[in-house]
Amino acid sequence: MAELNGSQILVECLKEQGVDTIFGYPGGAVLNLYDELYRHQDEIKHILTSHEQGAAHAADGYARATGKVGVCLATSGPGATNLVTGIANAYMDSVPMVAITGNVGTNLLGKDSFQEVDIAGVTMPITKHNFIVKDVKKLAKTIRRAFKIAASGRPGPVLVDITKDVTANKCEYKKEDVKKADKAKKEKSFTEKELDKAAEMIAKAKRPVIFLGGGAIISEAHKEIKALVDLMDAPVCDSLMGKGAFDGTDKRYMGMIGMHGTKTANFSVTECDLLVVLGARFSDRVTGNTKSFAKRAKILHIDIDPAEINKNVKVDLSIEGDVKDVLKELNKKLTKQSHDEWMEHIAEMQAKYPLRYHENELTGPYFIEELYRLTKGDAIISTEVGQHQMWAAQFYKYSKPRTLLTSGGLGTMGYGLGASIGAQIGLPNKQVINLAGDGCFRMNMNELATAAHYNVPIIEVVFNNNVLGMVRQWQTLFYGKRYSQTLLSQDIDYVKLAESMNIKAFRVTKKDEVDEVIKKALKAKGPVFIEVVIDKNESVWPMVPAGATLEETFSEEDVKEKETKAKK
C-alpha cells in the first residue's frame, strides 16, 4: 500500500478501469491532474480539444463506437459548464461517460470564488449520478463507483467534481481489480411466466412487427435479434438509435419508423396485430400521436429500464431485463412461424413506397448513396442534426451495430464532428465519416483544428445549402413560407477554412464530381473536408407532422397532388 496524492490516485484509478484516452482542456483547478497525466503520456493519451463541449462529444463518440466508457476532463467554472450540453446529450442517448471536473479548494466553496460553479447541482438532472469529492480518502472509491454506475444497467454519464486541494492531498492507495459492471441485475429480473406469455403472444400473431431501439445496440443483441426475426418470420423497423441492430440490407428490414420513417414501416406498425419492442423508449419522434400508435396491436416491450415501461405508450406485456439476456431465453421457447401473406403485403408496400429523391441534380441522398457504395457500408457514420441526419438514416445502410453515431434524444447541432474524432481515435483502423449541414458545422467547426492537430483521418462532409434546412422545411410546410432567420451567410469559403488548417479539401457542385472526390478522400492519410453544394429547397421525405398519426405519413408526391387539387 503506497501513499499517493489525489492526482496520482486518480490516474491510477483510470488505469485500473482500462482508460486509454481522455478528451479534455486544462485550467487552474485541474493543473495538478494535468501534471500527473504528463507523467503517464505513454499509458493514457490525452486529446486537447478546441472547446470543452468538443471534449464531451468526443468522449461520447468514443463510447458509442467502442462500447467502452468515454472520459472527458475540464476545469472549474466555465470549463465545467461547457461540458453540460455534451453530458445532456449522453444522458438522453444512454451513453456511458465519466466527466471529471476540477473545482476550487474546499475552503473556497460557497464563497463565489473565482471560477466556482456548483457543477454537481447544474448536472443533477442530466446525469445518472454525480459526486463532489472533498476528501482525498474517498477519491479512489468514488472513481470506481462512477465507472460502474456509468456502464451498469441502462448506461449514462456520471460526473465527478474534485476540489483542487484533494488533487494535492495524500492518502494511502491500494490497487483493486476492476469489477465488471453488471449489464442487468445480479438476479434475473424477468420470470419464466413472463417469457411464456411472450411466447404465447408471438405464436398467436398473424401480422407481427419487430421494432428496435437504442437498447438493442447497447445490449449487443444483434445475433439474438437475427434469430428472433428468423423464428417469427416478421418484418423489422428501427428508431434512429436502433440502426445497425439488424442488417439494413435484409429484405425483411423496412427502414426507420416515425417522423421521417418509411411509409412501409409506419403503415406496418399501424396494421400489425403484435408489436415486439426491443430496447426503445417510444419517443414522440417515433410514435406520433400516442393514442393511435399501433392501435390494432398488442405490444410486447422488453427493456432494461423499468422507468420506460408504460411511460409514453401503454403496453400489454412488459419484460424488464437486458434485451440480449431476455432474447436468449425467449428464443428457446419459440417455434418457427410462417407469415407468407403478411410478408407479401410488406414486400408490396416496399415496392409501392420506395425512398425517392431528385435524381437529375446533386442532392444529399445521392451523395450518401454513393458514399455507401464506395465504402461498401463498412464506415462508421456520425452526423450532426437536421436534414442530412435523416438522409444518413434513410440512404446509408447499416448492417452492424455501433456504426451510426448521432444525437437522437437531445438533437444537438455540433455533436458529430467531436463524436467522429472520438470514434476515430477509439477505432483507428476504421473509416469514420461525419455528415453535417452548414448550420451544424458552424456550431463546433473549431474541432476541425483538433482533427488537424492530431492528424485524425476523419472525413468531414458539409452539405451547404446556405440555410437551416430542417427549420426551413417546417417553415415551408407549416408556416406559410415565412422564412424567419433561417438564411445563413453565403460568403464563407469553407474549403479555404479547411485548407488554412492544412486539411485536404474539396468542393462538389455536380453529380459527376462525387465519385472521384469520395475516392480521393478515402485514400487520404489525414483529415479530409468535403463541401457538397446542394439546393436550399431540397427536403426530407416522407414526413409525419408533429402530433399527427403514423397513418398520416406523407411524401413530396402527396404534397404536390394536394396542391394540384387545391388549384382546381
Language-model segments: residues:
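N-terminal alpha/beta PP-like core and its mobile active-site loop of ThDP/TPP-dependent enzymes
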Residues: 1-334, 374-377, 457-460, 477-480, ...
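Active-site diphosphate/adenylate-binding microenvironment
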Residues: 7-11, 15, 19-20, 33-38, ...
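Active-site nucleophile and cofactor-binding loops and adjacent substrate-binding regions
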Residues: 25-27, 46-57, 72-79, 134-135, ...
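Glycine-rich phosphate/pyrophosphate-binding beta-alpha loops
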Residues: 27-30, 77, 94, 157, ...
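Thiamine diphosphate
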Residues: 115, 453-546
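Phosphate/pyrophosphate-binding active-site segments
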Residues: 137, 200, 296-387, 511, ...
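Hydrophobic, well-ordered secondary-structure elements that form the walls
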Residues: 299, 371, 383, 422, ...
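Catalytic phosphate/nucleotide-handling subdomain of diverse soluble enzymes
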Residues: 415, 419-457, 463
